[in-house]
Amino acid sequence: MKTPITEAIAAADNQGRFLSNTELQAVNGRYQRAAASLEAARSLTSNAERLINGAAQAVYSKFPYTSQMPGPQYASSAVGKAKCARDIGYYLRMVTYCLVVGGTGPMDEYLIAGLEEINRTFDLSPSWYVEALNYIKANHGLSGQAANEANTYIDYAINALS
């Protein structure tokens, strides 16, 4: 899994050298941001249920047909609503994993790689998840560096969906 730290180490090792001062500074910067990233991951995790439920409601409000149309890809039944919440939760989990490792590796490997195919196969609209992620970003309650760190990965997911 790629992270800024593993990439710096891999580059140095491939060239048979020690880490350069620039690479060491990048690693140090990651460690300085790590506390804020872990704070964000903890907060998102402890508030996950509230954020997921609120994000699902935001999707139903912006796209009312999602809770009115019958079908496996819609939230017109309890099963459909549970699937919607599960999917939103998956995006939120990926954000927390990225926060913990300090890079987009988890999202790249476990989510983005097959995202377009999954959405097409199951007739899911990326705009639903963009709305959910925008809700989470606007309502996560984080501030300062913790918010910056979380928003970086939320924006990364939004851009992947756009």
From Swiss-Prot:
Membrane topology: Peripheral membrane protein
The keyword Phosphoprotein is annotated on this UniProt entry: no
Keyword Membrane: yes
Pfam families: Phycobilisome
Protein residues bound to (2R,3E)-phycocyanobilin: P72, Q73, Y74, A75, K83, C84, A85, R86, D87, W128
Entry keywords, A to Z: Antenna complex, Bile pigment, Chloroplast, Chromophore, Electron transport, Membrane, Photosynthesis, Phycobilisome, Plastid, Thylakoid, Transport
Post-translational modification (record): Contains one covalently linked phycocyanobilin chromophore.
Residues in the signal sequence: none
Protein's GO biological process: photosynthesis
GO cellular component: chloroplast thylakoid membrane; phycobilisome
The organism's place on the tree of life at top rank: Eukaryota
Family, similarity comment: Belongs to the phycobiliprotein family.
Assembly description: Heterodimer of an alpha and a beta subunit. Dimers further assemble into trimers and the trimers into hexamers. The basic functional unit of phycobiliproteins is a ring-shaped hexamer formed from two back-to-back trimers contacting via the alpha chain subunits. The trimers are composed of alpha/beta subunit heterodimers arranged around a three-fold axis of symmetry. The phycoerythrins also contain a gamma subunit which is located in the center of the hexamer.
NCBIfam families (alphabetical): phycocy_alpha (TIGR01338)
Other comment: The light-harvesting antenna system in red algae and cyanobacteria is formed of phycobilisomes. These are composed of the phycobiliproteins phycoerythrin (CPE), phycocyanin (CPC) and allophycocyanin (APC). Cyanobacteria also contain phycoerythrocyanin (PCC). The phycobiliproteins all share the same subunit composition and organization with variations in the covalently bound open-chain tetrapyrrole chromophores.
Protein name (Swiss-Prot/TrEMBL): C-phycocyanin alpha chain
